[in-house]
Design a protein with these regions (language model features):
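Bacterial N-terminal signal peptides that target proteins for export
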Residues: 1-11
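Hydrophobic h-region of N-terminal signal peptides that target proteins for export
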Residues: 13-21
Length: 125
């Protein structure tokens, strides 16, 4: 198989995967976080709370669906992931100026979103 054909097939597979993932993201549109710093931080907290609920549902389903030997490992991995996320985002929050609060909030939102999507995908592998 030629290199160009392999690249085309690979790109098509990636695009198909992205479109499937995006289709699963439909639901409540996320609010826009425009405004002053306080409003933006509060908005990021609200978005994070939405993703955290979705994460908790996905985690409970993943634990329920996991093989018995996998459950303890999944629980341990989730505890360590929460510790990592919190420490990682705290780093951003310790920066200077009001932008640090926004960086920390976006860190929490984006990492929580990514983990929720990862756990939701466990049953589709």
């Amino acid at each position: 198989m030629s290199m160009m054909l392999r690249m085309t097939i690979g790109l098509a597979a990636v695009l198909a995967l992205v479109s499937v993932v995006r289709a699963g993201d439909q639901g409540e549109p996320e609010p826009s976080c425009d405004g002053n710093t306080f409003q933006m931080v509060e908005c990021l907290k609200a978005k994070t709370a939405q993703w955290d609920k979705r994460l908790n549902v996905a985690y409970q389903k993943a634990v329920q669906d996991a093989q018995p030997a996998q459950r303890d490992q999944l629980r341990a991995a989730q505890r360590l992931w929460v510790q990592y996320r919190d420490a990682n985002c705290l780093y951003y929050g310790m920066g200077e100026g009001t932008i640090a609060r926004l960086d920390a909030g976006e860190c929490m939102r984006s990492m929580t979103e990514a983990r929720a999507k990862e756990l939701e995908g466990l049953g589709h592998q």
